[in-house]
């Protein structure tokens, strides 16, 4: 049986979510994207077209579709896509549904891009997958040929919204103050409360909790004053974690039911893992409260995207690497028969740094980790591995990650950034022999902080020595030996301990600069 099909997608999701420098708007935008198809497509459009429809049974369906129970049937929602099936007697509704949905999105959520394509699908196990793949290809092709205008035009005579950069065309209240802002900003900002309510229910199963998630970037526990100087403690971190090879996993699904079931399992695993992270933070709260300047019951983390295999959150920079490490291990654990390997990018930025630029760097760092993952998997003939990369951004940064590392980590010998680093499962014993394992880097950083292997002033001197030539490395190591000190003893790092730099895969490398930079960005007791 062949029926009409409409495939929708949400485009430029990250740009829509992070195109503001107001945390409430970022959180609200994520909620809008996540609920778009259920709230607008299903409730506002399909359920009001005047005929019998089915918008919910896909949530519990386990058997294959052989016929439509209602003239209009929502077959699948997930991963930024929605598939709607329409029987042949009501083919005229296809264009009407697309028109009404896109119009509603433009009116309610200006700035949000959605795409749509139509075709036919055969409700047959083998042909169904082929037809659906063709729809996805067509939808992808449309992205390169259609570029809808979703913002009011800036004529040069209009006021610009301070928060979004769009044309300011409405008024928004901020406490006792009122500001002229863009409607695109207002729709996101006003969705914050609904997003916050759902977050509490998802993570704590109730709204009645004492714990508070920050609603402002300044509330993440940054240390406003410290005896140390140039520590960067007033920083936040943007963390982007993405599942590995998920597209390939979904392409292996031969039926819509398989795709839907996999989507639900992935989403459940992601939420379960993030819940575990929040529980870990609460369990360590005494340590956090000691080192961070947190308001009462304020958590130093705010999730922005927790959906599918995609997680983005902001947190206090001093817990970013350790929290991300724990979360990736939770994703990797095979509890309930589901394991997700992932890669992470962490951009550490000043609180006042442009938020979207920070997110772009986090995304590039995640891509860097994925590139390392693909190369490692191919050379070691393994299917899965997890990697993390990070960078510390201060002042003006280069437009690309490669240029940033070239500018900030250059030396006489080679680039001084050693990452990305491999993340192993909590019970994996192979980590002890891998020089690229994140736990080795953390071990070195902890030893630097404890001061037993060498004095703090020698650690600071080490960074400049690493930028210099081999003669200076030798002199530095000799000075350490003469004072009864040494480089940290780290499993798998014997070659670095002897010479500071060594050749790895035909390129001179050193991990010590990363370890030095991490010293102010890990907390004792979070291991």
Model-predicted regions and their roles:
Residues 1-527:
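Regulatory and interdomain segments flanking nucleotide-handling catalytic cores
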């Amino acid at each position: 049986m062949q029926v009409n099909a409409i495939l929708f997608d949400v485009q430029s999701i990250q740009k829509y979510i992070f195109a503001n420098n107001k945390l409430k708007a970022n959180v609200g935008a994520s909620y809008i994207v996540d609920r778009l198809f259920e709230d607008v497509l299903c409730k506002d459009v399909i359920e009001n077209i005047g005929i019998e429809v089915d918008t919910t049974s896909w949530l519990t369906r386990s058997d294959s579709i052989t016929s439509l129970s209602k003239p209009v049937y929502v077959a699948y929602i997930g991963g930024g896509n929605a598939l709607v099936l329409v029987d042949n007697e009501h083919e005229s509704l296809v264009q009407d549904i697309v028109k009404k949905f896109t119009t509603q999105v433009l009116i309610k959520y200006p700035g949000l891009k959605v795409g749509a394509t139509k075709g036919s699908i055969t409700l047959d196990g083998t042909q169904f997958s082929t037809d659906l793949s063709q729809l996805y290809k067509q939808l992808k092709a449309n992205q390169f040929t259609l570029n809808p205008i979703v913002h009011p035009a800036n004529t040069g005579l209009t006021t610009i919204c301070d928060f979004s950069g769009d044309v300011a065309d409405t008024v928004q209240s901020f406490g006792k103050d009122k500001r002229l802002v863009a409607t695109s900003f207002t729709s996101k900002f006003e969705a914050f409360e609904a997003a916050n309510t759902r977050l509490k229910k998802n993570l704590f199963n109730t709204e009645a909790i004492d714990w508070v998630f920050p609603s402002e970037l300044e509330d993440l526990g940054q240390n406003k004053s410290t005896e140390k100087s140039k520590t960067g403690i007033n920083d936040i971190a943007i963390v982007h974690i993405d599942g590995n090879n998920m597209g390939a996993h979904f392409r292996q699904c031969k039926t819509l039911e398989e795709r839907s079931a996999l989507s639900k399992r992935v989403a459940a695993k992601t939420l379960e893992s993030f819940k575990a992270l929040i529980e870990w933070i609460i369990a360590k709260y005494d340590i956090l409260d000691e080192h961070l300047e947190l308001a009462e019951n304020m958590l130093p983390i705010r999730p922005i995207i927790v959906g599918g295999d995609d997680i983005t959150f902001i947190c206090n920079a001093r817990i970013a690497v350790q929290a991300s490490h724990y979360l990736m291990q939770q994703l990797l654990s095979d509890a309930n028969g589901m394991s997700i390997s992932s890669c992470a990018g962490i951009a550490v930025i000043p609180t006042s740094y442009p938020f979207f630029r920070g997110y772009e760097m986090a995304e590039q760092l995640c891509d860097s980790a994925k590139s390392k993952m693909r190369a490692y998997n191919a050379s070691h003939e393994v299917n899965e591995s997890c990697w993390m990369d990070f960078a510390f951004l201060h002042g003006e940064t280069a437009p690309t990650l490669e240029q940033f590392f070239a500018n900030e980590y250059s030396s006489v010998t080679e680039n001084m950034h050693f990452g990305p680093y491999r993340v192993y499962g909590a019970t994996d014993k192979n980590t002890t022999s891998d020089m690229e394992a994140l736990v080795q880097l953390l071990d070195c950083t902890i030893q630097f902080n404890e001061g037993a292997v060498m004095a703090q002033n020698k650690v600071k001197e080490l960074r400049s020595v690493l930028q210099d030539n081999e003669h200076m490395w030798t002199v530095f190591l000799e000075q350490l030996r003469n004072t009864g000190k040494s480089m940290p003893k780290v499993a798998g790092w014997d070659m670095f301990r002897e010479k500071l730099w060594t050749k790895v895969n035909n390129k001179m490398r050193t991990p010590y600069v990363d370890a030095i930079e991490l010293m102010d960005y890990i907390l004792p007791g979070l291991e």
